A protein has these predicted regions:
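Terminal-region recognition feature
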Residues: 1-180, 184-187, 194-251
């Protein structure tokens, strides 16, 4: 049994899995990307903008890893800098101003931990997102599509509904990092993965997420159509809820 959680981690990290921009391209129409945080730069690890979902205007934000080595390098392997989180927050506040629901796709091993990111306020940027997301007056759905690593994932996951693909993972630390800290041996990553309760089934049983999304036909039109339909149905329901902020605040 201990082998199963770590196998899920390997699947979640697979280069062939659909990335954030794949979901944007195949689920939404008329996507217009916005760039920059208006403070420092444009972080390529986070893609965001406005689009339409079956005619509904939405703001969509995704942490993007890329598929090829060149794409992954360009996207910093899906590890956002502070300016990425600030860009995401700028888009969220804009969505709130214009009454647009927000959809986030999360796939990151964690926020970038380089010295330059720390100098530009990585911790503050993540904390600010978490704080501001609790008070957004529009519906928010966050979907973990691959890796959900620590605060780097949580900074886009303070939502009314949090979903996971069945082979996605969500954890405070990577199995390798946990094994290195607890046992000084990264080779015990499998044992660490089992202890971390990082699978979608674990997250649902603990009340961290509401729904596990089947990966049947993943990457095909039928898969994206199904995910898009579920998002639209949920947004329609959430849009009728007059107590979103209070419920979200109580949850987190």
């Amino acid at each position: 049994m201990n082998e199963i959680p770590y196998e899920r981690v390997k699947i979640a990290r697979d280069n062939g899995r659909p990335t954030g921009t794949d979901y944007i391209k195949n689920i939404f129409k008329n996507f217009i990307e916005f760039h920059g945080d208006r403070c420092y730069a444009d972080d390529k690890a986070i893609v965001g903008g406005i689009a339409r979902l079956n005619g509904m205007p939405v703001t969509v934000i995704a942490i993007e890893k890329g598929h090829t080595a060149k794409e992954r390098s360009y996207r910093n392997f899906g590890a956002p800098h502070p300016e990425g989180y600030r860009k995401a927050l700028r888009l969220m506040k804009q969505a709130e101003k214009f009454g647009r629901p927000i959809v986030c796709f999360i796939d990151t091993s964690g926020a970038y931990c380089g010295v330059e990111a720390e100098e530009r306020g990585q911790g503050q940027a993540i904390a600010r997102n978490i704080l501001e997301m609790t008070t957004l007056c529009v519906p928010v759905i966050s979907i973990l599509i691959g890796e959900g690593g620590s605060g780097g994932a949580l900074a886009l996951a303070v939502a009314d509904r949090v979903w996971m693909l069945e082979n996605a993972v969500y954890s405070v630390i990577s199995p390798e990092g946990c094994a290195s800290i607890l046992w000084k041996d990264a080779k015990k990553a499998g044992e660490a993965a089992a202890s971390l309760k990082l699978m979608a089934e674990d997250a649902k049983s603990l009340g961290v997420i509401e729904r596990i999304l089947s990966e049947n036909e993943i990457g095909k039109k039928e898969f994206y159509d199904r995910i898009g339909r579920l998002i639209k149905e949920e947004l329609d329901e959430l849009s009728r809820d007059t107590e979103l902020v209070g419920k979200r605040y109580d949850r987190f």
